[in-house]
A protein has these predicted regions:
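A conserved regulatory-domain signal marking ACT and ACT-like small-molecule sensing domains
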Residues: 1-138
């Protein structure tokens, strides 16, 4: 991807099942903060009566153990945490690079503001292959 700098990291994402009611997300994030866990990325989904939070945190194993010990159901999977320039076309170029290597994005979420680099959490069909592609493109 000529002209743009991609910074990427391999992380594990936690998927925490929570009740879909007022205060549960606040309680989860406060609980993690109380134990020194920083949240890098968050997305929420809901189903009938319950939901889940997908979180990328700075200490996955500690967070996973804390959440499990509190009685909540939690799962982990590998993801890529990627930072790209917050400019028109940068996301398209990243996705074109991955698509050129037959890598599908199963889901993702982003965060950022004007003037900031864009932070993305992407879940490609093959995380290891995507890492290799991004390393080669440096």
């Amino acid at each position: 991807m000529a002209g743009s700098k991609i910074v990427f990291f391999f992380f594990f994402q936690l998927k925490v099942y929570i009740d879909n009611r007022q205060g549960t997300l606040c309680a989860l994030t406060r609980f993690l903060a109380k134990h020194g866990i920083n949240i890098y990325g968050l997305t929420l989904a809901d189903t009938e009566g319950h939901g889940y939070a997908r979180l990328v945190v700075d200490d996955t194993e500690k967070a996973r153990q804390l959440v499990e010990d509190s009685g909540e159901l939690v799962a982990a999977r590998d993801v890529l945490l990627i930072r790209i320039a917050n400019e028109p076309g940068e996301l398209a170029r990243l996705l074109e690079l991955l698509a050129a290597h037959n890598l599908n994005i199963e889901y993702g979420y982003s965060a950022g503001g004007p003037g900031d680099d864009k932070g993305l959490v992407l879940v490609p069909s093959d995380v290891e292959a995507a890492l290799d592609v991004l390393k080669q493109d440096r």
